[in-house]
From Swiss-Prot:
Single GO term (MF): nucleic acid binding
SMART domains, per the entry: G_patch (SM00443)
Domain of life: Eukaryota
Example GO biological process: negative regulation of telomere maintenance via telomerase
Protein name as it appears in the record: Protein PXR1
Low complexity bias spans: 238-256
Gene that this sequence comes from: PXR1
Length: 288
């Protein structure tokens, strides 16, 4: 016996077949259809035989394209007039038209080629594009191929337009340079004027400062002179008062002899009072 394989447990949900939503009769869609006469078990359609009983699959829109954009894109990719794109039954219609016009064999051959191409492209999915179509020979305005003569004319016109653009660019560059030179001249002139103004202002300030200094010196000298004059006057007044006092003291005094004796006695008394030893001797006070 060999080894047992790895056990994998498969879990089933509550609704593995996803039929709970279709069997739920309380939903809005179910009730809305029943109002229009639909009953459970019936299909969708006007005739009961051809009605659809399968669930409708909704394709998820994962782009920003509008309605009909894919059909228009497929129409633009047509190879020839017999390319039917995604329209079913068009090949049969083309065969009928071929029979009526007497071109049944040609139409059948073209349709067989398309059928084989679809089979091959379905297997390998390769689409070959001719090298001529890669060139810019398609005119979107007229929706036709451009001839080489027209391409040469267009190229010459493009060259002329390039030359005109170069000339315009040069002219613009020259204008810009002229504007820059004018701006520089204006700036230089304005700078020179501003410098002159600054110099004149400095000169005026210096002159004012010199004048102020002179005025200050003159005021100080005047103040000094006034103060000196006042001092001289005061000294003269003092000298005059001193002279008058000296003259008054120099007058001869006729002091009487009695006053002179009294003054001497007073002086002696004061000297004795001021001297402590003399007082002790007078009052007979000993040091013991």
């Amino acid at each position: 016996m060999g080894l047992a394989a790895v056990k994998t447990r498969q879990k089933f949900g509550l609704d593995p077949r996803n039929t709970a939503w279709s069997n739920d009769q309380s939903r809005f869609g179910h009730k809305h259809l029943m109002r229009f006469g639909w009953q459970p078990g019936q299909g969708l359609g006007t005739q009961p035989v051809q009605s659809m009983k399968t669930h409708i699959k909704v394709s998820i829109k994962d782009d920003n394209l509008g309605l009909g954009a894919k059909l228009k894109k497929n129409k633009g990719d047509k190879i020839d007039e017999f390319d039917n794109g995604e329209c079913a039954g068009l090949d049969v219609f083309q065969r009928i038209l071929g029979r009526l016009n007497g071109k049944e064999t040609e139409v059948n051959k073209e349709l067989e080629i398309q059928r084989k191409d679809k089979i091959l492209n379905g297997k390998w999915g390769v689409h070959f594009v001719k090298g001529d179509t890669l060139a810019s020979t398609w005119d979107p305005k007229t929706k036709k191929l451009l001839s080489y003569s027209q391409m040469e004319k267009d190229s010459s016109s493009d060259e002329e337009s390039d030359d005109d653009e170069d000339e315009k660019k040069k002219h613009k560059i020259e204008k810009k340079e002229a504007k820059k030179s004018k701006k520089r001249k204006r700036d230089s002139e304005s700078d020179s004027e501003s410098k002159k103004k600054k110099k004149s202002k400095k000169d005026k300030k210096e002159k004012k400062s010199k004048k102020d200094k002179k005025n200050k010196k003159e005021k100080e000298s005047k103040k000094d002179k006034k103060s000196k004059h006042k001092k001289d006057k005061k000294q003269e007044i003092r000298t005059a008062s001193i002279e008058s006092s000296t003259s008054a003291t120099s007058i001869p005094e006729s002091v009487s002899t009695r006053l002179s004796v009294r003054s001497k006695w007073i002086k002696q008394k004061r000297a004795a009072v001021m001297d402590s030893k003399a007082l002790n001797e007078i009052f007979m006070v000993t040091g013991n």
